[in-house]
């Protein structure tokens, strides 16, 4: 199966390179689209993975095999999950793998992976951990596809209002 990685990372980024390596295990072509979709549009025969990307997929391009690695827990949709984890004095953070739908972090949740946060954690350290966990989610997803396993929602639900990028940047000031 071919894989298209939708991302905001730059070519040469070690995380993007690792993500590409994982996707190559499916045996098809792997390509990267930075902050957008392929010029040819989308198709039902390709696996699309939004890996640390900021792009919102338009409704007319949504496909069955389209997933997002959200670097935050289901309660912190959109931007700034790591900042909200610190503001709310949480003891753990998470990354969430979900199917992409027309909302911002609203698609069926496939898997959530939690990790501890302590008093020494910063937004940068939490994000660095989240990036690694997002890569683990890609590895898991590729393994499921490679082994022919059905991808099913976990039953976990999204909550909270999404934070916009503009709001996140304002709160960092």
Task: Give the role of each language-model region.
Residues 1-173:
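One-carbon transfer enzymes
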